[in-house]
Amino acid sequence: MKKIVLLRHGESTWNKENRFTGWTDVDLTEKGVAEAAKAGEILKKEGFIFDKAYTSYLKRAVKTLNCVLDKMDLDWINVEKTWRLNEKHYGTLQGLNKAETAEKYGAEQVQLWRRSFDIAPDPIPEDDPRNPRKDIRYKNVTNADLPATESLKDTIARTMPYWTDVIMKQLKTSNQLIVVAHGNSLRGVIKHLKNISDEDIVNLNLPTAVPYVFEFDDNLNMTRDYFLGDPEEVKKLMEAVANQAKKK
C-alpha cells in the first residue's frame, strides 16, 4: 500500500486577518507554527516515514513543511519546490478582507470568487507590484504561464500536470510522499482524486495543517482517504473555513 499525505499550510498572518492571500508571500503566525508542529507529531506517531516531499514557492507552505519534517526527524529527505503548487491567484482581491468584500459585493459573489469552479476575480494590472512577473522567484517561468488571476479551473490546469507527471510518477517507486500546499491547489488535486463534480467542489473546505491521507494500491488506484484527527474537530475546522466571508 502506498500513501500520499496532503497538508494545507498552518495559519498565516493573512488567514488570521481574514484576507485574500493568493500568491502574496505572507508568513505563518505563532498558531500556524504550532499547527504545523502538531501535524508533524501526529504523522510521526502514526508511523509515517516519507520518501520525498513537495511544496510550493510560498513561505507559509515551505515553513509548514520544514516544521513537519523537523518534528518527524526527517529534515534530511529530498524536498522539491514548485510554483505549480502555489495557491490560486486571487487577482485584485489579494490583500482585501473577505468579510468586508462580502459586504461590498455580496456574500454570494464572494463565495463564487472563493469556491466556484470557473469564475475568477478581476486580474491585477501588468504594472501592479503584486504581478508575479515582477517577482524574482518566477524568473524561470515564462510570462505566459504566470497568472494575473485564476479560477479553480485555472489552478487545476497548472497543478495537475505536475501532480500526474511528477508526484504520481514518483509514487511508482516510493511508499509515502507528503505534499504541503494551499487550500485551492489541494482542492484541485482532491477534486481529481475523488472525482468531485464542478458543482460540488464549492462545498469542499480544507482546514489548516490537518493531515489528509490518500491510500493507493500498487497500480496507483486510490483506495481510501481520511483525515488524521478527531472527526468532530475536523468538521468544526472545515466549517470555520467556510464561514470566513461572513461578518463577525
Curated annotation (Swiss-Prot):
Keywords: Gluconeogenesis, Glycolysis, Isomerase
EC main group: isomerase
Regions annotated as coiled coil: none
Catalytic activity: (2R)-2-phosphoglycerate = (2R)-3-phosphoglycerate
GO biological process: gluconeogenesis; glycolytic process
Pathway where this protein functions: Carbohydrate degradation; glycolysis; pyruvate from D-glyceraldehyde 3-phosphate: step 3/5
GO molecular function terms listed in the Swiss-Prot or TrEMBL record: phosphoglycerate mutase activity
Sequence intervals crossing the membrane: none
Keyword set includes Isomerase: yes
Enzyme Commission number, as recorded: 5.4.2.11
Domain of life where this protein originates: Bacteria
UniProt-annotated catalytic positions: 9, 87
Entries under InterPro entries matching the protein: His_Pase_superF_clade-1, His_PPase_superfam, PG/BPGM_mutase_AS, Phosphogly_mut1
PROSITE patterns linked to this entry: PG_MUTASE (PS00175)
SMART domains named among the record's database cross-references: PGAM
Pfam families, per the entry: His_Phos_1
Residues where substrate binds: 8-15, 21-22, 60, 87-90, 98, 114-115, 183-184
SUPFAM superfamilies assigned to the protein according to its UniProt record, in alphabetical order: Phosphoglycerate mutase-like (SSF53254)
Residues under site feature: Transition state stabilizer: 182
Function: Catalyzes the interconversion of 2-phosphoglycerate and 3-phosphoglycerate.
Family under the similarity heading: Belongs to the phosphoglycerate mutase family. BPG-dependent PGAM subfamily.
Name of the featured protein: 2,3-bisphosphoglycerate-dependent phosphoglycerate mutase
Organism: Elusimicrobium minutum (strain Pei191)
